[in-house]
Amino acid sequence: MDSPVSKTDASKEKFVASRPSTADSKTMRGCGLANLAWVGVDKVELRQRLMMPEYLRLAMRDCIKRKDSSAIPDHLLLPGGAVADMAPHAPMVVFINPNSGGRHGPVLKERLQQLMSEEQVFDLTEVKPHEFVRYGLGCLEKVAAEGDECAKECRARLRIMVAGGDGTVGWVLGCLGELNKDGKSQIPPVGVIPLGTGNDLSRSFGWGGSFPFAWRSAVKRTLHRASMGPVARLDSWKILVSMPSGEVVDPPYSLKPAEENELDQGLDAGIDAPPLAKAYEGVFYNYLSIGMDAQVAYGFHHLRNTKPYLAQGPISNKIIYSSFGCSQGWFCTPCVNDPGLRGLRNIMKIHIKKVNCSQWEEIAVPKNVRSIVALNLHSYGSGSHPWGNLKPDYLEKRGFVEAHCDDGLIEIFGFKQGWHASFVMAELISAKHIAQAAAVRFELRGGDWRDAFLQMDGEPWKQPMSTEYSTFVEIKKVPYQSLMINNE
């Protein structure tokens, strides 16, 4: 039987699959961005291109320290405002997670401060992204409102780089998303210096999967590319977990108690909904998964948090991770157990909404699928493409469209067990395709299972289940899109 995956050149297919669909992501191809790795970048010219005038840098620094966007000393305000040509071509700030990237974190911070300025590099252990958005950008906007053309241009041209992993990038994107809620139209685009483990957000927008060995020269090239790279769009997805009265034990950072239970009433859940429900909400940019993969991740994270001395490097991490997979039956289910009994169809129902459709539609949970993933990006699990690059005739047959990270659709697929997942991640076969959807609702009901395991962008948690009432996990697109700098 023919594979649904296209058999054209693999390297070419990976490149196409990871490219956002926006037209402006293609406009810089002729500008030589792909060859910038071989072009020397002058340090002085780069500094002039990125560094904001001193009076603006100091004003923003003071406002952030005082947590007051109006605390601008008079001596830092230029009489009559500044002329527009004082604004740099691409004013930039960098957020760095010093705990990422091993020993590179602190020295990278120092290198960035040398290339730009100390005031434009923010240590995330000292300045949080929401503080910069509220007080730093707020300061810039207040100075611009006083007639300062330089401040106005800096605010309009501002770009942000994040040195960290996917979790750090998502943190910054989430804080910038608050500008949309406040009705702000100028949202700074974000680029990535990959310091994490998976770095799937970084891979998806051309910033690579790891920090380069020759990092000193690479930092200059990266900042130069970020100053001129095209802007692409990225969907983000809101998750709402509605459960019987109780609490999630040790919820991840990205999952917060919801003020209101805003479960979509378009699908009648009255029979199975508890009289008093507890709700949690969060936002993800890459994926949400339910099942054995999340259970293995939860066990590994719990061990790493309680016994960090056992997980001190990538090799030991992989050994421990694999042992968890085997001990919990992900790779080797005990013979006394029927693998089908561990299938998610025993505890789960799935409903989806298709594009431009207000009605929920129930879809079947495939037999023996033990992990289900709702994926936004093409890159998953450190650069794999589990959805695959599907042939046009297969797309038409299944009613799918080519997947992009800005198309308002999320891809849903399943893994049967660890070996199946391993072959999928090696791109030898495709995952079990289930659906493409504009909204998803998972309904979980415990039987012999007391808990389900979920993870969102790499953060796992244990989700208690009831045998009497259902737990609902609803995914909907966030109304606004994030802006990313595309290093194509």
From Swiss-Prot:
Enzyme Commission identifier(s): 2.7.1.107
MF-aspect GO terms: ATP binding; ATP-dependent diacylglycerol kinase activity
UniProt GO cellular component terms: plasmodesma
Stored Pfam families: DAGK_acc (PF00609), DAGK_cat (PF00781)
Entry's Gene Ontology BP terms: defense response; phospholipase C-activating G protein-coupled receptor signaling pathway
SMART domains recorded: DAGKa (SM00045), DAGKc (SM00046)
Record keywords: ATP-binding, Kinase, Nucleotide-binding, Plant defense, Stress response, Transferase
Region ranges (Disordered): 1-24
Keyword Ribonucleoprotein: no
Residue ranges annotated for the DAGKc domain, each copy included: 87-245
Reaction catalysed by this enzyme: a 1,2-diacyl-sn-glycerol + ATP = a 1,2-diacyl-sn-glycero-3-phosphate + ADP + H(+)
SUPFAM superfamilies given in the database record: NAD kinase/diacylglycerol kinase-like (SSF111331)
EC main group: transferase
Function of the protein: Phosphorylates the second messenger diacylglycerol (DAG) to generate phosphatidic acid (PA), another important signaling molecule. PA is required for plant development and responses to abiotic stress and pathogen attack. May be involved in the accumulation of PA during cold stress.
Similarity comment: family membership: Belongs to the eukaryotic diacylglycerol kinase family.
Assembly notes: Monomer.
PANTHER family, alphabetized: DIACYLGLYCEROL KINASE, DIACYLGLYCEROL KINASE 3
Listed name of the protein: Diacylglycerol kinase 3
Species of origin: Arabidopsis thaliana (Mouse-ear cress)
